[in-house]
Amino acid sequence: MAASHSFAFVVCVLEIGALTAGPTPSYVHEPIQRSDPLQPIDCRMSPWSEWSHCDPCLRQMFRSRSIEVFGQFHGKSCVDALGDRRACIPTEACEDAEEDCEKDEFHCGTGRCIKRRLLCNGDNDCGDFSDEDDCETEPRLTCRNREVQESELARTAGYGINILGMDPLATPFDNEYYHGLCDRVWDGNTLTHYRKPWNVAVLAYETKIDKNFRTEYYEEQMQAFKSIIEEETSNFNANLALKFTPTEAKASKAEEASPKNKSLDDNDKGFSSKFQFSYSKNETYQLFLSYSSQKEKMFLLVKGIIQLGRFVMKNRGVMLTNTFLDDIKSLPTTYEKGEYFAFLETYGTHYSSSGSLGGRYELIYVLDKASMKEKGIELNDIKKCLGFDLDLSLNIPGKSAGLSLTGQANKNNCLKSGHGNAVNITRANLIDDVISLIRGGTQKFAFELKEKLLTKAKMVDVTDFINWASSLSDAPVLINQKLSPIYNLIPVKIKDAHQKRQNLERGIEDYINEFSTKKCSPCQNGGTALLMDGQCLCTCPFMFEGIACEISKRKLA
């Protein structure tokens, strides 16, 4: 299919990786006798610092503390705030920066300055519609009679990441600001013209899909876990430290700026999180880590990626949300760890200067290796039954709009004769669990898949992938991005901009060092420590288990 065609095209990629640890011997538990049984380690914090001086502009004073030791071995986790604030009466005057608009500009109710030519054009240029309040005549619509829709891909453009894997609560970009322009972009999948926001330099609807599912299987749990979290932390975080639950105080209106308010689910604390279907990230990883390799489990990872479009953000003159600007102004000029950590947990440590949008389909099948061996079932038999050995084809719509994928699991492939008996793979207790790490898609699909997993349905197959893919255009997420530090977005005109930029640089470095596995007790017998939401965990080599990898397993003669 020619790339010059006006409709979307397909890039076919074949990538099947297989990582194995060789044949698995049978073991029996034989715990090593210990004279010093492991005791729970509770989170230990440093004492609070002294209160800072009273900030004359914020009329607040601050203090902070540090984490000395993380919880471990079922001890209390470190989930309390590291920063504190209280109101105060300043002893010096606040030197506020002048923020008057130019003569040819209109001063919005939000404090934003816009050109007067943008008044009464039907667009929400101010962010609170105050530019549309006093119109003596009918608004002169920017797009006039041209058909155009708001783009979900464009709303998500620029979204960032947190270096520890947490989903930011808000975006810094106002991607519903158009600067009086009506730049339209055609989407061949939905047969719709979408409006390109002012902040987005390039918006292109280009559909690409892996022709084949990428499958990987692991016998070592730690290998599988590293493969999963590499994408969550974008390879920034090398010390296996993950933090999914915000712990610092948040700006009250920051969530309102987030495009994820249209997304699927909420995490444990009630904040909007990024399109997780079955569980919060914390619950998902805890569930995965509850399956140990020593119980003769095998982990099959199935991945499929669909790209719907790509974007490039402008590198200057962008329109930031009012809440983002207010939160920058609310940062103290002196470095206060808790306040800067809160900002990073709200907006992320980095934003996306360019990237692609769509969805990432990722499932972990926990397989019972002993049962597979007993029934004569191989890994390829399971992949074939689930339909993950099939080629996918993308149909370009004609008269009817929408992304159309074809691919069908053949249930006859789920029957296999082995060891003298016919085995039905779907009913043979070969798949212990299916763990979802899917990103993107609408609420309807989320509920359907969640219900399927909660009923312990093991047959999440290629048909579910097709259903998910059809919902992506309504709820895309970032699947690939080029990142830039969040402090690059601080406008130079803001008071103390240079000092706050330096403070944010320091804050990112401190954030990484604060939540580090260096504050965990060592795991025994070659185990690897990882940190998840304030609790240190041990993942063990194949021949050991236990909360510290302290239990040996000896091979049967």
Swiss-Prot record:
Arranged from A to Z, the UniProt key words for this protein are: Complement alternate pathway, Complement pathway, Cytolysis, Disulfide bond, EGF-like domain, Glycoprotein, Immunity, Innate immunity, Membrane, Membrane attack complex, Secreted, Signal, Target cell membrane, Target membrane, Transmembrane, Transmembrane beta strand
Pfam families assigned: Ldl_recept_a (PF00057), MACPF (PF01823), TSP_1 (PF00090)
Q: Can you give the residue ranges of the EGF-like domain?
A: 520-550
- InterPro entries named in the record: EGF-like_dom, LDL_receptor-like_sf, LDLR_class-A_CS, LDrepeatLR_classA_rpt, MAC_perforin, MACPF, MACPF_CS, TSP1_rpt
Spell out the GO cellular component terms annotated for this protein, sorted alphabetically and separated by semicolons: extracellular space; membrane attack complex; other organism cell membrane; plasma membrane
Q: In this protein, which residues make up the domain named MACPF?
A: 139-519
Activity regulation field: Membrane attack complex (MAC) assembly is inhibited by CD59, thereby protecting self-cells from damage during complement activation. CD59 acts by preventing incorporation of the multiple copies of C9 required for complete formation of the osmolytic pore. MAC assembly is also inhibited by clusterin (CLU) chaperones that inhibit polymerization of C9.
Family recorded in the similarity comment: Belongs to the complement C6/C7/C8/C9 family.
Name this polypeptide is given = Complement component C9
Q: Which organism is it from?
A: Oryctolagus cuniculus (Rabbit)
